[in-house]
């Protein structure tokens, strides 16, 4: 990234503007303020930086610009941009070329989407964008390369969606190396961003309520990290993935994904507080944005619009919102998820 102009030269834009006329709108909107946590209910969807139509996953709706008006029209007011490339040494890349026709939004386009109502967070991780959490040097390299991207592209927050490499120590009060390095990453990012910069997390259920069965390895591995940021107020909300496998309640009880019963058991467990080795990890309803597949095929445990409505209505507006994988999947099948939830928020 090019260095900023010396403050002694700030008169230059005025001279250029005077000689050449007003600067074009795109030049004026390259930067925009961090928006902070949305005050109302949220419908959060993942935006894919690859083409799911071209590769045959979810035709006919594939990649779409992040400022596409359809996204907002169908209810999505929080966008999780997925995912940056992470090189083995921790270097983060956010660039065109995931597929031939795919382009990441320019800073001006990000501002355009935000001005239209979107809060945009960058989602880190996913099933294929792992980071080596065994190395503090890799963690530091990631922080040093992702922060300039977050600033340059006007992101409002980060979403932690790491699905590989995180493992618990077996003792809830002692962080493993991988847990400590994930905290190192989160703290490193938050320390360099505005105070209203957001943090969300989207772990699979095994990493959270799975800790009710046993604490160690992947089981419950997110719990001490969730507790740290829920307790200190930096966690906007939790997007636990209520899909892709059976789900556990607070007492080791098991539920099928895609059921209202399982949705309620998970949600109530987090609100009540999961007790692990005498430590309580609690995420109240107003910090829960449960994650569901947008359409059949997007993930195991798909819930029909009717079942989604039953699950949401059970809480009479207590939940912060709902998350879905993904905006692009929803667009491929008529936006039924977004339209259904939009009418209930």
From Swiss-Prot:
Organism domain of life: Eukaryota
Cellular compartments annotated: Secreted
Catalytic activity: Random endo-hydrolysis of N-acetyl-beta-D-glucosaminide (1->4)-beta-linkages in chitin and chitodextrins
GO BP annotation list: chitin catabolic process; polysaccharide catabolic process
Stored PANTHER family: ENDOCHITINASE
Family: Belongs to the glycosyl hydrolase 18 family. Chitinase class V subfamily.
Protein name, UniProt field: Endochitinase 4
